[in-house]
């Protein structure tokens, strides 16, 4: 679903830094059309999940794993399973099952192969649409906040900084710049989030995790700010001509906090073009238009232009009645037979009377036993038990066994 573009201001203020030449008038730049493009989270998620697979390294288990023994099945008739077993003796390993995926020391089920389809091809136009959507989403404050960035002290979005930031060489100076433009709190959040990864990933060269901070986009090739910002945790630096969806929407989530330099911001129109003008850098590329300029569908349907060509409502048309089963639907039965409700109620009352009468009849038959009668019954049971034990006690055991003919 295409989301309406929220960044609709005609001009964007360029934030000046300490040491810049003071001017009477505040610098502004025109908002590029790419910031007004439709935002498609479905395309961004699809493209991100596919291009992120292109950096995978093929892996597989050894072809020999689990088969480095001369095990053979014992066959049937040995009262053991027919799984191949290790030959020999004198060791615990002899006679153990081998080869199968259910065996200790056996191979895995369907051993992994390196000829898996690791990489994915994505249409060029689809990749461009995803990047354009990510750029447009970076100018929407609600999406940037929803992604978790700290932008409470940022003057405005999109955030454009003067080109003097490209001359920053030291990391200490870079931190001062972040404080001036209000992006330091987001960088601090990324730094404080540095922690050890939970789970098995910490054993697999993915030991530490940390959140993403601001993305610095510069326009001059070979700018000095790359070395100044590259050592700050969570901050990424990228050239405007090499914008990457993995940096603009990490994890496929829209709304990365982006800091643009003035030169980079001015290049966006030439790189991505506009809704009417073809891009200068991308052959024949024009920004995608939204399917609907106005998302209020009810307003469109009820407009004079649409209503003037819509066919009038047909009057006098007869619709086939919906047939309902009165045996299952009570309201339908009551329309056909109002007495059905009374008949059902009478049957329920009659059933309740029958249950009550049966209970009273059984209660009369079941007379309660007094304590004296209960003790008499218990004593009779004990006497019978003692009689049974005494009758089974054979004193003349030898004569009895001779009579049975049992030899000792």
Swiss-Prot record:
GO MF term (any one): structural constituent of ribosome
Q: Does the keyword Ribonucleoprotein apply?
A: yes
The entry's keywords: Ribonucleoprotein, Ribosomal protein
In this chain, the stretch annotated as Disordered covers 58-98
Pfam families noted in UniProt: Ribos_L4_asso_C, Ribosomal_L4
For this record, an example GO cellular component is: ribosome
List the GO biological process terms: translation
Among Gene3D superfamilies, the record links this protein to: 3.40.1370.10
Family, according to the entry, reads as follows:
Belongs to the universal ribosomal protein uL4 family.
Protein name, per record: Large ribosomal subunit protein uL4
Q: Which organism is it from?
A: Prunus armeniaca (Apricot)
> What gene is it encoded by?
RPL4
């Amino acid at each position: 679903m295409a989301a309406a573009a929220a960044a609709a201001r005609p001009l964007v203020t360029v934030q000046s830094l300490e040491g810049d030449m003071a001017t009477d008038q505040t610098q502004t730049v025109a908002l590029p059309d790419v910031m007004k493009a439709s935002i498609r989270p479905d395309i961004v998620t699809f493209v991100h999940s596919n291009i992120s697979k292109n950096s995978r390294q093929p892996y597989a288990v050894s072809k020999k794993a689990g088969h480095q023994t001369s095990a053979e099945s014992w066959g049937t008739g040995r009262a053991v399973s027919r799984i191949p077993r290790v030959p020999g003796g004198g060791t615990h390993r002899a006679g153990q099952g081998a080869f199968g995926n259910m065996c200790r020391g056996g191979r895995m089920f369907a051993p992994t192969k390196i000829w898996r389809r690791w990489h994915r091809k994505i249409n060029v136009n689809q990749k461009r649409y995803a990047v354009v959507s990510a750029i447009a989403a970076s100018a929407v404050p609600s999406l940037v906040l929803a992604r978790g960035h700290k932008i409470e002290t940022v003057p405005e979005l999109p955030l454009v900084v003067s080109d003097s930031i490209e001359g920053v060489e030291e990391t200490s100076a870079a931190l001062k710049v972040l404080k001036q433009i209000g992006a330091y709190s987001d960088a601090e959040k990324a730094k404080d989030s540095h922690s050890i990864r939970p789970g098995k990933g910490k054993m697999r060269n993915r030991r530490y995790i940390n959140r993403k901070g601001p993305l610095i986009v510069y326009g001059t090739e070979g700018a000095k700010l790359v070395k100044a910002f590259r050592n700050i945790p969570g901050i990424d630096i990228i050239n405007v001509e090499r914008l990457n969806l993995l940096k603009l929407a990490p994890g496929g989530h829209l709304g990365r906090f982006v800091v643009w330099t003035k030169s980079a911001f001015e290049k966006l129109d030439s790189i991505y073009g506009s809704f009417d003008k073809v891009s200068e850098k991308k052959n024949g590329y024009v920004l995608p238009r939204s399917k609907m300029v106005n998302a209020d569908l009810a307003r469109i349907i009820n407009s004079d232009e649409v209503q003037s060509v819509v066919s009038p409502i047909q009057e006098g048309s007869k619709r086939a009645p919906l047939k309902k089963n009165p045996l299952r639907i009570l309201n339908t039965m009551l329309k056909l037979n109002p007495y059905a409700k009374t008949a059902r109620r009478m049957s329920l009352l009659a059933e309740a009377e029958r249950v009550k009468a049966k209970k009273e009849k059984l209660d009369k038959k079941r007379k309660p036993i007094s304590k004296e009668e209960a003790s008499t019954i218990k004593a009779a049971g004990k006497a019978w038990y003692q009689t049974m034990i005494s009758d089974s006690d054979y004193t003349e055991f030898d004569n009895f066994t001779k009579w049975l003919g049992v030899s000792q």
